[in-house]
């Protein structure tokens, strides 16, 4: 992890926009691979990906996952295999206070409907908000 942190620091110094994100790869209930780009957060214990518990990806993270990062500014990539675990509720509550208003509104929406659920139209989404 020390080398990862040093390389990520170098990518941040180079203002690499990819230093803030990673690709999380999982396998869905049908055995199909799923990959999505997420913000990669630093926490004292290591790294964190914030995943809404109502999202299908939360269930998928309960097994083995793969994380891929690519920092073009320093020509370095990492492929990491890991297991995920939930962060303490206190940590999540503190972090949530730092979020911008729009993501907070989206969190409220996810309490009404599961994340990644189909929305029939933009108007329907705006009506929910």
Regions found by a protein language model. Give the residues of each.
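Binding-site signature for planar aromatic cofactors or substrates
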Residues: 1-129
């Amino acid at each position: 992890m020390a080398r990862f942190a040093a390389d990520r620091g170098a990518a941040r110094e180079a203002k690499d926009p990819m230093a803030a994100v990673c690709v999380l790869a999982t396998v869905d209930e049908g055995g199909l691979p799923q990959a999505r780009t997420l913000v990669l957060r630093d926490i004292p214990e290591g790294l964190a990906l914030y995943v809404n518990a109502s999202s299908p990806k939360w269930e998928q993270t309960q097994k083995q996952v793969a994380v891929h990062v690519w920092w073009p500014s320093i020509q370095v990539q990492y492929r990491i295999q890991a297991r995920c675990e939930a962060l303490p509720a206190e940590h999540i509550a503190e972090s949530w206070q730092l979020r911008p208003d729009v993501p907070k509104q989206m969190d409220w929406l996810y309490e009404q409907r599961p994340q990644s659920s189909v929305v029939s139209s933009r108007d329907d989404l705006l009506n929910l908000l």
